[in-house]
Amino acid sequence: MAPARAGCCPLLLLLLGLWVAEVLVRAKPKDMTSSQWFKTQHVQPSPQACNSAMSIINKYTERCKDLNTFLHEPFSSVAITCQTPNIACKNSCKNCHQSHGPMSLTMGELTSGKYPNCRYKEKHLNTPYIVACDPPQQGDPGYPLVPVHLDKVV
């Protein structure tokens, strides 16, 4: 029994380490609400070049984010999406909402580089999106629900 248990411990430690690293990468800055962090990462009413837009986001985490989507509409329009009927999110929670129709967005995918010299390939789309929404926290705009996570591009 002991050799088998000793053999699985390093694997468990590796998995725990990878999970902690993933949580730290996704963690929002301490001085922002989840909705403020969503806005920083995803709301970009006027399209910008991915490399420069991503450099702002990457400064918060001090790493190159692998993939990011920018919604080219004001925060108020994304917040209105939170008023559409609830649907299931990818994680099975029921706090997701789909945009009314196709929206202009840009997806940026990391192609090369190490922080702070991250390089991205951008792809422009016109497609619906799904966001997770929660009640606002102190410091958030006064909508009944605010977007906190971009769950999926449809």
UniProtKB/Swiss-Prot annotation:
One of its GO terms (biological process) is defense response to fungus. InterPro entries: RNaseA (IPR001427), RNaseA-like_dom_sf (IPR036816), RNaseA_AS (IPR023411), RNaseA_domain (IPR023412). It comes from the Eukaryota. Its EC number is 3.1.27.-. Residues 1-27 form the signal peptide. GO terms for molecular function: nucleic acid binding; ribonuclease A activity; RNA nuclease activity. Keywords: Disulfide bond, Endonuclease, Hydrolase, Nuclease, Secreted, Signal. One of its GO terms (cellular component) is extracellular space. It holds the Pfam family RnaseA. This is Ribonuclease 8. The gene is RNASE8.
